[in-house]
Amino acid sequence: MKVGIMGGTGNIGEGLARRIXIGGKYDVMIKGRDKA
């Protein structure tokens, strides 16, 4: 989660989800892609 929030993996969807707020639901997908 730290890498996703502050790391900035270059995922535009991550930034948008975080701003909208829907980061919780997209967080799972982002985390899965980050590890993969």
Swiss-Prot record:
- Record-listed E.C. numbers: 1.5.1.40
**Is-annotated flag, keyword Transferase?**
no
Q: Which Gene Ontology MF annotations are present?
A: 8-hydroxy-5-deazaflavin:NADPH oxidoreductase activity
Q: Which superkingdom?
A: Archaea
Q: How does activity depend on temperature?
A: Optimum temperature is 34 degrees Celsius.
Q: Does the keyword Phosphoprotein apply?
A: no
Reaction catalyzed: reduced coenzyme F420-(gamma-L-Glu)(n) + NADP(+) = oxidized coenzyme F420-(gamma-L-Glu)(n) + NADPH + 2 H(+)
Q: What class of enzyme is it?
A: oxidoreductase
- Stated pH dependence: Optimum pH is 5.5 for F420 reduction with NADPH, and 9.2 for NADP(+) reduction with F420H(2).
Entry keyword set = NADP, Oxidoreductase
Which parts of the sequence bind NADP(+)? 9-12
What is the protein's quaternary organization?
Answer: Homotetramer.
Query: So what family is this one in?
Result: Belongs to the F420-dependent NADP reductase family.
* Reported function: Catalyzes the reduction of NADP(+) with F420H(2) via hydride transfer, and the reverse reaction, i.e. the reduction of F420 with NADPH. In M.organophilum, an alcohol-fermenting methanogen containing an NADP-dependent alcohol dehydrogenase, is probably involved in the regeneration of F420H(2) required for CO(2) reduction to methane. Thus, during growth on alcohol and CO(2), the F420-dependent NADP reductase probably has the function of coupling the NADP-dependent oxidation of the alcohol to the aldehyde with the F420-dependent reduction of CO(2) to methane.
Name-wise, this protein is F420-dependent NADP reductase
Q: Which organism is it from?
A: Methanogenium organophilum
Its lineage opens with: Archaea, Methanobacteriati, Methanobacteriota, Stenosarchaea group, Methanomicrobia
